Amino acid sequence: MSRFLICSFALVLLYPAGIDMYLVGLPRIAADLNASEAQLHIAFSVYLAGMAAAMLFAGKVADRSGRKPVAIPGAALFIIASVFCSLAETSTLFLAGRFLQGLGAGCCYVVAFAILRDTLDDRRRAKVLSLLNGITCIIPVLAPVLGHLIMLKFPWQSLFWTMATMGIAVLMLSLFILKETRPAAPAASDKPRENSESLLNRFFLSRVVITTLSVSVILTFVNTSPVLLMEIMGFERGEYATIMALTAGVSMTVSFSTPFALGIFKPRTLMITSQVLFLAAGITLAVSPSHAVSLFGITLICAGFSVGFGVAMSQALGPFSLRAGVASSTLGIAQVCGSSLWIWLAAVVGIGAWNMLIGILIACSIVSLLLIMFVAPGRPVAAHEEIHHHA
């Protein structure tokens, strides 16, 4: 079992590493490529576009051909794209490399969640996804620090060589450690069960909405945090970095505590707690009389996301034993596109950073609480799920 957990964690971590590690080198990259920092900030959106594009096909291929045939090319593409970015001499080539990086990371991301669905029952999967969420929260803190240390001695290209090295590690794990987990092709008698795993299942769609809104909350916070903390609240850059590190610490602490909470409370209770924390955060930020109270509201956002997201993802994947790859892809596409669409629309309409965050917090909590209350699982979830591996 440990091999599957190690491989899944490694496959997922390419995604946040590809986002956060290069940011510290952005000024030098812009100078070397004769582009403005503003022009290169689109590299974030290009990377996410690559991930979304990969998810359109990766899940279906993973369900038909297996997890390894998607993970291995995905890791290889991430390596090649990282090297391509390091060799880019124009901003156009650099952005093309970032899109390819996103494609590779997207393939690996989809496979990671499919593997966890293949190998873990619902309760254990919820615990592991909560731990994974905590580890993912470490990357936005550690990656820029590692990038800064690298750039003290080496040029910005070394950041992408470091990412390539990470990709090589994932490729080696996928080649030599990961074993195929895709369930065996169903017999004719099992076809009705395969056909019953519909993406239009009300319970699955409700969890897609809940997780998409939750990701929209956390990405809205990350996207607006420089404006909120430095421009509106007046913190210095160093203080901003400290606050963001503390919020990551809150996320990690809650994420690592959630598996223990699942041993005491029902998953539904934790999901309700998550949305109540979002609602409390929105109200706190809306009526906040001081910076201290606002910072408390921000910690509620991080705690709310960490306590409920892994549980919701586990529930979303639960009904899909034969189509876990497609389900994972659908979740990823909805989360990436839905959150990006909200942030873009809010900016186009002219909603301020503060109101943008308060609005998504309150909308997410109300909609999600209604879905949790009124949309129950369509079938009982087995306490244990036997894995039928390919020979």
From Swiss-Prot:
SUPFAM superfamilies associated with the record: MFS general substrate transporter (SSF103473)
Domain of life: Bacteria
Entry's transmembrane regions: 4-24, 42-62, 69-89, 93-113, 131-151, 158-178, 203-222, 245-265, 269-289, 293-313, 331-351, 356-376
Keyword list, A-Z: Antibiotic resistance, Cell inner membrane, Cell membrane, Membrane, Transmembrane, Transmembrane helix, Transport
Any GO BP: response to antibiotic
Cysteines joined through disulfide linkages: none
Cell inner membrane in keyword set: yes
Gene3D superfamilies with a match to the protein in the record: Multidrug resistance protein D (1.20.1720.10)
Membrane topology: Multi-pass membrane protein
Gene Ontology MF terms in the entry: transmembrane transporter activity
Annotated InterPro entries: MFS, MFS_dom, MFS_Efflux_Transporters, MFS_trans_sf, Multidrug-R_MdtL
Stated role: Confers resistance to chloramphenicol.
Name of the protein this chain belongs to: Multidrug resistance protein MdtL
Organism of derivation: Escherichia coli (strain SMS-3-5 / SECEC)
